[in-house]
Amino acid sequence: MSTTIDTIYDDFAFLDDWEERYRYIIDLGNGLEPYPEAARDEAHRVRGCVSQVWLHTERGDGDDPVLTFRGDSDAHIVRGLVAIMMLLFSGRRASEILAIDAENVMRKLGLDEHLTPQRANGLRSMVQRIRNEATEVAPAAG
């Protein structure tokens, strides 16, 4: 069974404390697909993150293309947060990505209260980068 955001909600509810949840987040990061070494460059780096974070986007065809994201970080917990963002956004159409309320997901997981301000800002930077990628290719509203 593949992990979904609903699975993460359920698993977080089951785990007793934040030490266990952080271990779970690290495990999610360890499950990321290997990130291409050639994409560990300035063009793919997410600015606004204290840790090194890289994000690579593949765009499908059409008016509302599917965007596939791959990401990585040099920090264990941040790599886990990258994994959560990949589960939330990757493999969706641009218009679907723009409709996702990532802040609400973070609140439901309790991350808004348990991340350092630096990690929370980095997470927002990653979400903004993903949203910017989707905005570039999403069909115009109207």
Regions found by a protein language model. Name each.
Residues 1-52, 59-63, 106-142:
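N-terminal intrinsically disordered, cationic/polar leader segments
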Residues 6, 79-80, 100:
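A generic alpha-helix surface/boundary motif
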Residues 58-77, 86-90:
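Conserved interaction-surface patches within small, structured recognition/assembly domains
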Residues 73, 89-90, 101, 113, ...:
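Generic hydrophobic/packing signal
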Residues 74, 84-87, 109, 121:
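Feature captures hydrophobic
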Residues 91-106:
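Glycine-rich phosphate/pyrophosphate-binding loops
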